[in-house]
């Protein structure tokens, strides 16, 4: 199973992320966002940021997850390539670590800046075999 793919969207970028678990799908959604920013295969998981979030539903939790990661990119130039997280659907909380390193222009390719997560076309579906997350980011 592929981890994520991009789809056409006027002036923005759409992402479809897949995972056998909800946590894997959220991780792959984040990986897709950072793949827009740089080549994540060159991002070493050297340091991490702990993340604790709560939401009112899964879509809101995903929105906050991506926004939190983009906050670290905007404020610290952190780019991420590995994610360890747990999602509790009863309390609608996410707890985890995002692993990566500070962006270094000598190592990391500068691609497109992701400005923000959006609610446009945001959906989280559970199929028989996997979770599918669809969303659009503003570039």
UniProtKB/Swiss-Prot annotation:
UniProt protein name: Protein archease
Q: A Gene Ontology biological process annotation?
A: tRNA splicing, via endonucleolytic cleavage and ligation
Q: Which PANTHER family match?
A: ARCHEASE, PROTEIN ARCHEASE
Matches recorded under InterPro entries: Archease (IPR002804), Archease_arc (IPR022952), Archease_dom (IPR023572), Archease_dom_sf (IPR036820)
The taxonomic lineage of its organism, from the top, reads: Archaea, Thermoproteota, Thermoprotei, Sulfolobales, Sulfolobaceae
Which UniProt keywords are given for this protein, alphabetically ordered?
A: Calcium, Metal-binding, tRNA processing
Main role? Activates the tRNA-splicing ligase complex by facilitating the enzymatic turnover of catalytic subunit RtcB. Acts by promoting the guanylylation of RtcB, a key intermediate step in tRNA ligation. Can also alter the NTP specificity of RtcB such that ATP, dGTP or ITP is used efficiently.
Single GO MF annotation = calcium ion binding
Q: Which NCBIfam families match?
A: PRK00407.1
Q: Which HAMAP family match?
A: Archease_arch
What family does the entry list?
Belongs to the archease family.
Q: Name one Pfam family in it.
A: Archease
Which residues take part in binding Ca(2+)? 12, 138-139
> Domain of life, per the record?
Archaea
């Amino acid at each position: 199973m592929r981890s994520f793919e991009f789809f056409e969207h006027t002036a923005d970028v759409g992402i479809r992320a897949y995972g056998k678990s909800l946590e894997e799908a959220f991780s792959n959604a984040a990986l897709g966002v950072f793949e827009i920013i740089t080549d994540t295969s060159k991002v070493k998981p050297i340091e991490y940021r702990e993340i604790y979030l709560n939401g009112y539903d899964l879509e809101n939790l995903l929105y906050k997850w991506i926004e939190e990661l983009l906050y670290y990119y905007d404020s610290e130039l952190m780019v991420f390539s590995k994610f360890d997280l747990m999602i509790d659907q009863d309390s609608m909380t996410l707890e985890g670590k995002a692993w990566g390193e500070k962006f270094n222009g000598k190592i990391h390719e500068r691609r497109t800046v992701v400005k923000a997560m959006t609610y446009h076309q945001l959906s989280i579906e559970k199929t028989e075999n996997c979770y599918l997350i669809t969303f659009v980011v503003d570039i």
